[in-house]
Amino acid sequence: MLARGILRPALARAELGRAFSCSAQWQQAAGSTSGRELSWPDFFALRKTERRINTGSSVLTAFLTANCAWAYISTVQIDVTQMLFGFDPMVVLVGALFASSGLGYLCGPLMGSAFFRVKHRGQLEGYNHKNRVFLEHIKKNRVDASSQSFSNPLPDYYGEKIGSLQEYRQWLRDCQSHRRKAKEFL
């Protein structure tokens, strides 16, 4: 009787574990089929769109922050005989203008990716899944960075320039060629 009581909770946990894992598998299968599955050409087109939106928003935010900085700098009264941080005041103000536009350029992808998410809300789940799968392929197939040299440079290490299936296949061939050259010459 005591043995049955001890074994029974273990069996119950095993059954419960199977029940939850089975339902999780069904939920994953149902979740992946409920949304529209994104094809690889569609994924690469969306990836290119996201990159263009991010670049455009970077340029726009750099322009806006430079204009805001210019509006502030144009109202500042400076004394040309006084040094700012050990430099001429005009050099410091121009440096501040460039720094503000650089900061705006760096903040641009935040706005661009938010705009991309809103614009492509329906395809976002499939896009994120394909992006994870694509980045796993990149990690698995990229070459070792320690074997690079001037005569044998690395192919695109992060896969940022891959924009189609043909370019992906070419990237795989380039990685294989790099591995072969690194093995032959070392």
UniProtKB/Swiss-Prot annotation:
Keyword Ligase: no
Keywords linked to the UniProt accession: Membrane, Mitochondrion, Mitochondrion inner membrane, Protein transport, Transit peptide, Translocation, Transmembrane, Transmembrane helix, Transport
Subcellular locations according to the entry: Mitochondrion inner membrane
Signal peptide: none
Subcellular location, principal: mitochondrion
Mode of membrane association: Multi-pass membrane protein
Transit peptide: 1-27
Alphabetical GO biological process terms: protein import into mitochondrial matrix
Top-level taxon of origin: Eukaryota
InterPro entries associated with the record: Pam17
Bilayer-crossing regions: 58-78, 93-115
GO cellular component, one term: PAM complex, Tim23 associated import motor
Assembly and oligomerization: Component of the PAM complex, at least composed of mtHsp70 (SSC1), MGE1, TIM44, PAM16, PAM17 and PAM18.
Described purpose of this protein according to its UniProt entry: Component of the PAM complex, a complex required for the translocation of transit peptide-containing proteins from the inner membrane into the mitochondrial matrix in an ATP-dependent manner.
Family: Belongs to the PAM17 family.
Official protein name in the record: Presequence translocated-associated motor subunit PAM17, mitochondrial
Organism: Eremothecium gossypii (strain ATCC 10895 / CBS 109.51 / FGSC 9923 / NRRL Y-1056)
Gene name, Swiss-Prot/TrEMBL: PAM17
